[in-house]
Amino acid sequence: MQEIESLHQSVLLQEVLQAFAPLEEGVLIDCTLGLGGHSKALLSQKPHLKLIGIDKDKFAQEIAKERLKAFEGRYNLLSGGFAKRFKEALEMHGERIKGVLVDLGVSSLQLDDDNRGFNFHSHALDMRMDLESDLNAQKVINSYSVVALEKIFRDYGEIKEYKKIAHKIAERRAKKPFKDAKDLSDFLSSFSKNKKIHPATLVFQAVRIEVNSELEELKEFLQCARNLKGAILCVISFHSLEDALVKNAFKDYAKNCICDPSSFKCTCSNNHALGTILTKKPIIPSPEEIKNNRRSRSAKMRVFQFKP
């Protein structure tokens, strides 16, 4: 546990604490509990706050539970997808919910575990957040049709040569199926010309998003979050697809006029905004944080305040 405390670094921790500074009591939902770094800091600073922590990864949740021992009685941990669990919590707690945090990053524990398949050198080709899920990365890479691979590489990886990569993977797996993440990573490196990032980065991102239904879950959550009243919503994203969904949802929440854009005149009374966007531009890590934690470099945090 001491090793976890020293190695685990919660992204934008001080900025998250600042975002929730106005909260004094009520319920805060950490939709992506992970190892509990953000939750631990918030419970430490807010003695009257109650916490609901949600995570698909039961192993990570056990570690978080150990880290939160000092706050026994002030938190409740739930397993499962955060969109579904958040909806249930919202129905149960309603306006007692004063804050919601979503950190969409993969935890260091998952990235560094060679048995999980998230890194380029893993001995597995898995990438599941929920180890009880049926779909894993090996099934995607070795059994998806070429057309299906093209679609996820284009839509989830934003890969320019998505057709070429899908066809090369299909040709190679016909001779010899991919056995682990290192095998896939080495294969992609053998023909990719991308020098800015590791040749496997965007393919791994696309497959991980597919395996965990990440964008669908985020969309479902953002739709449900419209029903919050008087709460602060803080979302940390790590790539442009996530950030675009959050940015557009917040803009939609803040709209006063809900008339059809083709209308010549507003007839809706122009007062339908659900609240206020508190971050005109996303908050990003400081150079010092990036220096201390390279994995934080692509993080973007957006904050929205819902009206009571």
From Swiss-Prot:
It comes from the Bacteria. The keyword Cytoplasm applies. Belongs to the methyltransferase superfamily. RsmH family. It comes from Helicobacter pylori (strain P12). S-adenosyl-L-methionine binds at residues 36-38, 55, 86, 103, 110. One of its GO terms (molecular function) is rRNA (cytosine-N4-)-methyltransferase activity. Transmembrane segments: none annotated. This is Ribosomal RNA small subunit methyltransferase H. The gene is rsmH.
